[in-house]
A protein has these predicted regions:
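Polar/charged alpha-helical tracts
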Residues: 4, 14, 18, 90, ...
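Flexible domain-boundary/linker segments
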Residues: 68-70, 139, 201
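Catalytic cores of extracellular degradative/oxidative enzymes
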Residues: 1-127
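Residue-identity detector for glycine
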Residues: 8-9, 36, 43-48, 65, ...
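Active-site-proximal alpha-helical
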Residues: 82-196
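Beta/coil-rich, acidic/histidine-enriched accessory regions frequently appended to metallopeptidases
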Residues: 156-255
Length: 255
């Protein structure tokens, strides 16, 4: 690639061509990660290098008919987590056990960036409430942005009177038609003002969800409770349990 080369808009790239044989869409993770950045999606604090992977899951599932678990697995090329595996990956951390939010320090200890547990909450919303719930949410975000009335944009307090994280939980809940607070809390994003958020949820007529309750009970049942179960999970996401890597993340964290 030569940045000084004049292409007149005709730069040849593999993803612009009808390749023969066609490139397997399951291996487009990096391209869709960068395309995700280009969408300028807002997210919870710390999701910047996480949520951008998620639209690829929608494309694989809706466009190519890939089942939800496989579609989610293929959203990154360096790991092999289903949503259930991502839940386990989060539940076996000290932060989860101690009731803390997911680490978003942008250090090697960060538990969001480039990791499927960092955006699995959206996969759960899609699995429990359908893709339309997320389509409703992001469509409204786009409409509001274009109209210059985005609920939260570089403001500590949003137009709905809630702080940013709480407002996003509230808006996602409205799009899904149910109170998503417990689900999002499970995934390590805690309300800043739970009282104000609960009042907004109630005022909007959003109820507690039995399917969320059932999902959280299910997650409690798959959390490893001993070393053998931990190693079974390790083998699932990193076959062969390789003994290398940085101790703060990836395969090295498991060692």
């Amino acid at each position: 690639y030569n940045p000084l080369e004049e292409t007149n808009g005709n730069q040849v790239a593999w993803f612009l061509l009808n390749q023969t044989p066609p490139r397997n869409p399951l291996f487009w993770a990096t391209e869709f990660h960068e395309l995700g950045h280009a969408q300028l999606m807002q997210g919870f604090w710390g999701e910047g290098e996480a949520i951008v992977n998620f639209p690829f899951s929608y494309v694989l599932n809706e466009k190519f008919g890939v089942d939800n678990d496989t579609a989610f697995q293929k959203t990154v090329s360096h790991a092999n987590y289903t949503v259930d595996d991502a839940a386990i990956h989060w539940m076996i951390t000290e932060n989860f056990r101690n009731g803390n939010p997911m680490d978003n320090s942008n250090t090697t200890l960060d538990e969001f960036r480039y990791q499927q547990r960092g955006y699995a909450k959206y996969a759960d919303i899609a699995r429990l409430f359908g893709w339309q719930a997320l389509k409703n949410f992001f469509y409204q975000e786009n409409v509001d942005f274009n109209a210059g009335t985005l609920t939260c944009f570089e403001e500590a307090v949003c137009r709905d009177g809630l702080v940013q994280a709480d407002s996003r939980i509230f808006r996602l809940s409205k799009a899904a038609g149910a109170d998503l607070t417990p689900l999002i809390h499970f995934w390590g994003v805690h309300p800043d003002n739970s009282t104000a958020l609960a009042q907004a949820i109630t005022a909007a007529g959003l109820d507690n969800s039995t399917i969320i309750r059932d999902k959280l009970v299910y997650y409690a049942g798959i959390a490893p409770t001993n070393n053998a179960q931990f190693n079974t999970h390790f083998e699932t996401v990193f076959p062969g349990r390789p003994a290398y890597g940085h101790p703060d993340y990836g395969v090295g964290w498991y060692n």
